[in-house]
Amino acid sequence: QKNKLKYLVGKVDMIESVDSEELIRLIDKRAQNLGIVQDILIEVNIGGEASKSGVKPEEVEALVALAASLPGVEPRGLMAIPPVAHEPGANRAVFAAMRQLFIDIKGKTYNNKVNIDCLSMGMSGDFEDAIAEGATQVRVGTALFGARPANRVNG
């Protein structure tokens, strides 16, 4: 969300859901104004779901190259939130596709500017498969803290 960037840039180690050229340029501008370099992850819509944000896999390389060319941002890798899995192993192929995309991006030099080292994918229900497919970060909030309470309507 563009309106929250002014609160994030320089206050978090990494912005993990960057999915457009516009966001990259806004982060770069804010980071330069602060005299810092902001680490980012490019969010990939690996499942092609209309309900999820993220770029198409074929758009990733151009965004990483753009970020690598700007002084205020450093692309560190990729992140994805997989489709909801209703059975164990259901997202294994999705994680394998993300791993291959990560390997492809990591293999590019981008003028030796970047250190692509983060593959963020997998959640409480499928993190083991994500790790087996190369994830370096997982989201396991539900496993640690339990399910979020259902939304309540105040009345």
Indicate where each model-derived feature is located:
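Conserved alpha/beta-domain cores
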Residues: 1-125, 131-133, 145-147
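C-terminal helical cap(s) of enzyme catalytic domains, especially alpha/beta-barrels
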Residues: 131-155
